[in-house]
Structures are given as C-alpha cells and as structure tokens.
C-alpha cells in the first residue's frame, strides 16, 4: 500500500517533519510518498495546498496524512477542508499543556527555530565548525577542547555522526581515522593517547564497508573485501586491547549512533 503524507508548517517545517517521520516509521508495511511544505503562511498558500492534497488523494485513491504545525486559525480551517486526514500537532498538545501550566501559549510562528529566541544558536555553529576543523584527523592539537573523539576505519560513519551531534546537541566532536600503519603498531597513535578518556570507537561489517568504499574508489585495494575485513578485525582488536567502548554502525541510523554514544560516554548535551 502507498499513501501520501504532507508535513505542513507556517515556519521551517522541521517540527512537523520530525514528529511526522517518527510516527510514520512505525508502519513498516506502508510506503509513504512524503512532501514537506514550509512557510504556508497565507490564505492563498493554504488554498493552493488544499489543491495539492486533493490531487494526491485522487491519484492515490486514499486520503493523504497531514501533519501540521500551523498557528493561524484561518489557515488551519482552510487546510481542514481538504480531502486529507489532518493531525494538528499544536492543537493536540498545546491545549492540555495550557491546562496543566495554567498559562496561555504565545502561539508564535517559528518559535522553536528562531535565532532571536534561541540562545543555543551560536553554540550550534561553534560545534559544527569544530567538527569540520577537526575532521578526519586533519588537526589534533585542539583535542583538549573536544567533548568526544570518534575513532575507526575510514568510511565507517565518523564524520556524519560528529556533524549530527554538533547540529543537534552542540557537542564538540572530533574524529580520527585509524589506518593500516596504526594497526601495525598495535597501539593508539600518539595524538590519541593523552585523550583516551574521550575516545569512542565505530566499527562496521566488512561487506558494508566494501560497498561504501567501492562507491569512492572502485576496484581498488582500499575497497577490496580482504582489506576491509583486515582493517575491521584489527581495529576491533585495538578497541578491546585499549578498552575503548565501541558500537557497530552497520544497522543503525546516525541518530541512533549518536544517542548510544552520548549514553555510553555520559556526555551531557549542551542544549536539548
């Protein structure tokens, strides 16, 4: 079965999309065609949106699922005339919160993502810059300022994990690729020894690593199964020998990997 799903907002759409994606992921037997529609902030845009939803309903033979975070009541009422199943995120959660807190909501558009109301903005930018500056072992003399240092073979997911933790939580994460030379010495590189308490290892199944590396350097020694299997085996041995906590990234999303790392290392998010 295939259904259409719309994430509609009068702001960036991040909240509607994030919550909507999480809910739809629980229905593994249904394929969803997903459409994010940010900045639906006028009556005219809302009417055009209704036309899109109705066209999708006619094409699919099922009414689309709509997740919205629209603040304006007039716009919400227009969207409600569409041939879609509407889940109004704000009205679902704000009313009981207002009752519990004995306080009326401000009903402000884009409140959670605006720079002016987000004291975490600069923290996020600094963390992203740190992750980029300290990517792939390019620099090691700022490791004293790192919250975490991810280590593992090349192409096992270190960079996207560092960037995700920087963007989402303000974590200053560096990463260092362990090479064949490092494995031959049977010990941590000198640049990492002084920061062993910050290290967390990522490993990966050799066949998955082979597929990833073949996209970058096909038919090379670097991407051969034998080389990938050797590197993964030796790095896992190093992790055990040096007592470095680690996880296999093969079957986890970057979100899951990041959450597991923070729990395992006990690192507090700079913002939540």
From Swiss-Prot:
- Which keywords label this protein? Kinase, Nucleotide-binding, Serine/threonine-protein kinase, Transferase
Q: What class of enzyme is it?
A: transferase
Q: Which domain of life is it from?
A: Bacteria
Query: Where along this sequence does the record place binding of ADP?
Result: 152-159
Q: Which GO terms describe its molecular function?
A: ADP binding; ATP binding; phosphotransferase activity, phosphate group as acceptor; protein serine/threonine kinase activity
Q: Give the matching InterPro entries.
A: Kinase-pyrophosphorylase, PSRP
Q: What is its EC number?
A: 2.7.11.33, 2.7.4.28
Q: Which PANTHER family match?
A: PYRUVATE, PHOSPHATE DIKINASE REGULATORY PROTEIN 1, CHLOROPLASTIC
NCBIfam families of this UniProt entry? PRK05339.1
**Physiological role:** Bifunctional serine/threonine kinase and phosphorylase involved in the regulation of the phosphoenolpyruvate synthase (PEPS) by catalyzing its phosphorylation/dephosphorylation.
What name has this protein been given in UniProt? Putative phosphoenolpyruvate synthase regulatory protein
Species of provenance: Pseudomonas fluorescens (strain SBW25)
